[in-house]
């Protein structure tokens, strides 16, 4: 079974993009339902904490993501989010694609370091055929992804705007289809 784990930044800097992000997530899920109806999806929202909106759900069973489900606030704990998600999945025999979308940079992780995450990513890509996608709006997006061991071909710099977020999810869709 293949699964997509969508890690969605819900830090305070995303406040002005709430409606656009919700719509883009719904469009992404609808497209995935058409392309990969048997896949499962987990949607993990993160700031300095993580919340699992959908967990290991079949795409066909996922309800509409609503504005009330996405309330941005707080800081951005990218390493802790990746670490927690990897820890949750790594003992399953599931082929996972982790797709992370952030408008900022790491500023709140307490449990995991970039070095620990990089080591895990390399192990999972080599031994379990996991894939990692990193979409970021920060000017250091490619460097941030490289530090984590995520390849340039699976990394993109996006624009955190009403126009940029839908484009980012469309790009994510293509990246997932190509791996």
Indicate where each model-derived feature is located:
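Acidic, low-complexity intrinsically disordered regions
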Residues: 1-179
């Amino acid at each position: 079974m293949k699964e997509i784990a969508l890690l969605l930044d819900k830090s305070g800097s995303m406040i002005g993009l709430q409606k656009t992000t919700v719509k883009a997530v719904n469009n992404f899920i609808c497209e995935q339902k058409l392309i990969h109806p048997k896949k499962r999806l987990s949607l993990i929202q993160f700031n300095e904490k993580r919340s699992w909106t959908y967990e290991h759900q079949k795409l066909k069973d996922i309800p509409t993501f609503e504005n009330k489900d996405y309330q941005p606030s707080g800081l951005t704990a990218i390493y802790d989010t990746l670490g927690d998600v990897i820890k949750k999945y790594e003992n399953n025999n599931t082929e996972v694609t982790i797709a992370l979308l952030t408008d900022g940079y790491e500023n709140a992780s307490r449990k995991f370091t970039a070095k620990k995450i990089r080591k895990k990513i390399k192990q999972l890509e080599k031994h379990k055929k996991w894939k990692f996608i990193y979409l970021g709006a920060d000017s250091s997006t490619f460097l941030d992804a490289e530090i984590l061991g995520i390849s340039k071909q699976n990394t993109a710099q996006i624009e955190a705007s009403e126009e940029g977020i839908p484009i980012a999810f469309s790009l994510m869709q293509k990246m997932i289809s190509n791996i």
